Amino acid sequence: VSVVTEDWRWRMVTPLKGDAASIPINAEARKIVDAWDPAKDEAAGLQCRAYGAPAIMRVPGRLRISWLNDNTLKVETDAGTQTRLFHFGGQAPAGGKPTWQGYSAARWEAGQAARGSPGLGLGLAPREGTRSRSLEVVTTQLSPGYLRKNGVPYSGRTTLTEYYDRFTEPTGEEWFTVTTIVADPVYLYIPFVTTTDFKKERDGSRWHATPCSAR
């Protein structure tokens, strides 16, 4: 389950129209932010704009993580009822159709032995000093969407890079932190970086799938 300890006003409630604080948007993005109208998204069947891969890990909710096969990790969200697939051992196919979750190429960082084929240099340069298990995921082929529910945009040219670091507390609680880096040459003048924490629950009894909401 996601543990929200920061950015409460942007994550736990729908931000006010025009509130893009802390996101490095440019003038073109500002026009879209100021024109946001959730009714238009609903009428167009685009309620899931804020549930695409660049934003979904910031949406409060629960995850189900399982292996679809030896080279594909499946991540399901109850918020928005979304499914992400992390593909090991390859790159995004040319000419793939854009979707909310895009195509995610994954690899374990150097020194990690796990399922999935190892790869080199999917995204940013390898980090140093990380002791926990680290998974790197690079996502492209995205449909344009929102970084926040109030219409802060990202474009179809966005590249999403994520690092997943798993660790165990002395109490035995299992956690992971995902560092999310959104690079968008259309609407951001520098990459937008966040970190988000998740804690493992005892079972899946609190899972509550909900549809996307534009409001």
Where would I find each of the regions flagged by the language model?
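PEST-like low-complexity, intrinsically disordered acidic/proline/serine-rich tracts
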Residues: 1-215
